[in-house]
Amino acid sequence: MRHTTLIALLTLVIATSPLANADETCNSPYIAKLIKGQEDYVYVWTLGVEGIGDGSDKLVTVDVNPKSKRYGKVIHSVPTGSRVEAHHMGFTDDRRHLWAGGLADNRIWVFDIATDPAKPRIVQTISDLGEKSGWLGPHTYYAMPGRMLVQALSNTQDKGGRTGMALYNNKGKFIASYAMPTENGGDGYGYDLAVNPRKNVLLTSSFTGYANYMRPIGDLMKDGEAMKKFGATMAVWDLKAMKAGKVFSVPGAPLEIRWSLNPKDDWAITAAALTSKLWLIKQEGKEWVAKEVGTIGDPSKIPLPVDISITRDGKGLWVNTFMDGKTRYFDLSNPEAPKQTYEKVTGKQVNMISQSWDGKRVYITSSLLASWDKGGADNEQFLRGFAWDGKELSHRFEVDFTKQKLGRAHHMKLGSNALRTAAPKK
């Protein structure tokens, strides 16, 4: 029933209004400590489920080093004591801390992952996002030099889609807020952000607000006015001035943004969820443009692309589609014309996808949103690890998050013992 209802909802959204991170190759360019060898851990930010285990959101640590006796096993978990739709997380620029939050709340939990990478611990809870900025539902945590730029999805006044970004220092002190553009075609909505320092450009994308994303699917699809309240834009910002400039119309919900990591490239790519299209953002002359450049699966079947992961050379792109449970690989040798070269069903529902820096290991999780995940036997909740040889994804391990009473597996970040550092002296 849940699967059928979600299809109906998505079809209605397409007809009425366009709908609206993850791994070693999509971190902020200001993070210097990248794991370029074998990662030791995958940190999984996990939604709590009432009646399963402690019911709390938690950060779960899984050992993913094949040489370890604990390979593919959960070795640690840190409950927050709350259940607030745990969603995304991001490293500080020094990679000592991991910031994580939920879409149903304004709290941000700060985990120390440097003192003992195998056993993260909560060292701070930031709770003034709503009070200081007026935003609600922190989504993206993007490292800046000594700072963290947080993109929210909603606001505290009407819990709609009008939102913005908040800037903090690494100690958790609020510095400034920036509203998403509402002029020159802007709709005020937000979702992801990504920076190209060489071009002094910040890109943002758009989704919807708390009032929509927290509603049960069945209720939402019956509300015609609510269905009109989804974003369909991307914006180019002057990074240094933190001012929005050109706004692009990108139908179908542009979600995750990935800049090519090739030093010779200055383009970014995103996937539009409801139209199943790939969009390229690039500079032509002095103007930034957005182009539809590819199709993901059969758009009429609404595969729902939800997460993407770009290879370190900018030549390949992984795309996960939630509804059909498929993981696809696109050749980006010509970013103007992406070509799908591989696909595999990796779950009954799949959401986030992460890859190692060398591209040889791929990790996939299952949960989208608590009220949007499938029901019954299709509601698989897992972390699955795969090996990639350039031709085939080969299954290596699985952690069943329901069986182990952990919750719904969502966002991932990679950890390494090589990044262990002593706590700085106060």
Residue ranges and their predicted role:
Residues T25-K33, D54, G81-D93, E131-R147, ...:
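Beta-rich, blade/repeat-based domains predominating
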